[in-house]
């Protein structure tokens, strides 16, 4: 879901207006890479790297569809990637310049092909699930030892949420993640595009809206790690980062992540090259660098997300490859679902719905 490299972000804020042939510009999610890899890329390739970050697919999509973003590599989630490909936002990859693509994992390539047929425009960077992060001790204090921490009822049952509000609840600011979860909770198809069914999701969300402290797609990491909140509905790797930050701080906060038993969204973040990328050669150099098995393992070992690189698995630390919250077992995989993009009409409905939910009015 991711570490911003501030020196590179500063270059965007204060630096070059036009990209040079020796400069590669990457736009990725915040807190999503080991910054040592960024310096390594520069040292190995001779390119100057400008690395900027974002916190929502909507922000990225606005830049892409407006054109002239100035980026060479961007990282949309699969559902957004699909409609961006259809809109002509990306150029096909030249796999002759990507020899490390042989390291990619067929299992993940098969799944990402639903968004990008033949994986012609993108490679998988990371994948994971969306679920529930809890401060185990605080939730037990509020709801008791039998609190349903592995169920969507924890965050969608108003009786639970009213109590949890006392210790703080954050939700992702991501309608494409939260609405499917609400639908799964009420027993509807998480991928439904039916306006009447989406209205039911709105009702479920509005019922718990008074108890949600904040909608944000990255702040919950530190808030959960520091004990400022007790529940976050967020991305698997972010919550596991919060767990590890709490452990490193030795602050007594015990963070746990669970994919809901009712089903969890499986998402894929894909690296792609915009159609108007200033440095296509540099973009391919960056993609090939990332697909190196050791480099991809270093990224996953840092952010605690699974990746689509089979060759990297021998270099993953046991805390990553051996954790079923990151690399799910077959039973968990069978309970994961994926969703398809909203068309323009449904997107307008969802935008209105989400605006209402966030405002609480």
Annotate each predicted stretch with a short phrase.
Residues 198-207, 213, 251-272:
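Periplasmic-binding protein-like
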Residues 80-83, 231-252:
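A ligand-binding cleft/hinge motif common to bilobed small-molecule-binding domains
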Residues 91-102, 249-265, 274-277:
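Short beta-strand->loop
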Residues 75, 81, 85-211, 218-225:
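Extracytoplasmic ligand-binding site segments that recognize negatively charged/polar headgroups
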Residues 22-84:
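Early extracytoplasmic/lumenal segment of secretory-pathway proteins
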Residues 222, 330-361:
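Conserved C-terminal helix/tail region of periplasmic/extracytoplasmic solute-binding proteins
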């Amino acid at each position: 879901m991711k570490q911003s490299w501030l020196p590179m972000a500063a270059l965007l804020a204060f630096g070059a207006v036009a990209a040079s042939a020796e400069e590669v510009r990457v736009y990725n999610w915040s807190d999503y890479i080991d910054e040592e890899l960024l310096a390594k890329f520069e040292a190995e390739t001779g390119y100057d790297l400008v690395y900027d970050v974002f916190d929502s697919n909507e922000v990225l999509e606005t830049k892409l569809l407006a054109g002239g973003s100035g980026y060479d590599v961007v990282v949309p989630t699969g559902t957004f990637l699909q409609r961006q490909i259809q809109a002509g936002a990306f150029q096909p990859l030249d796999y002759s310049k990507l020899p490390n693509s042989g390291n990619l994992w067929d299992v993940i390539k098969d799944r990402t092909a639903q968004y990008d047929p033949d994986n012609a425009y993108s490679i998988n960077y990371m994948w994971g699930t969306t679920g529930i992060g809890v401060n185990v001790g605080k939730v037990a204090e509020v709801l008791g030892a039998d609190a349903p921490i592995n169920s969507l009822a924890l965050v969608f049952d108003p009786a639970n949420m009213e109590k949890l509000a006392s210790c703080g609840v954050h939700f992702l600011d991501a309608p494409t993640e939260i609405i499917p979860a609400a639908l799964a909770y009420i027993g509807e198809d998480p991928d439904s595009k039916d306006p009447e069914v989406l209205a039911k999701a709105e009702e479920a969300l509005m019922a718990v809206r008074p108890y949600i402290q904040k909608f944000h797609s990255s702040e919950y990491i530190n808030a959960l790690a520091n004990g400022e909140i007790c529940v976050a509905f967020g991305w698997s790797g972010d919550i596991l980062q919060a767990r590890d930050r709490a452990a490193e701080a030795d602050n007594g906060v015990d963070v746990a992540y669970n994919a809901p038993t009712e089903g969890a969204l499986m998402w894929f973040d894909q690296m792609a090259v915009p159609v108007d990328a200033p440095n296509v050669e540099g973009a391919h150099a960056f993609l090939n660098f990332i697909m190196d098995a050791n480099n991809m393992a270093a990224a996953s070992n840092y952010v605690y997300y699974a990746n689509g690189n089979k060759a990297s698995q021998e270099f993953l630390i046991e805390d990553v490859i051996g954790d079923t919250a990151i690399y799910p077992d077959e039973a968990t995989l069978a309970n994961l679902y994926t969703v398809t993009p909203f068309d323009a009409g449904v997107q307008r409905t969802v935008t209105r719905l989400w605006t209402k939910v966030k405002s609480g009015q």
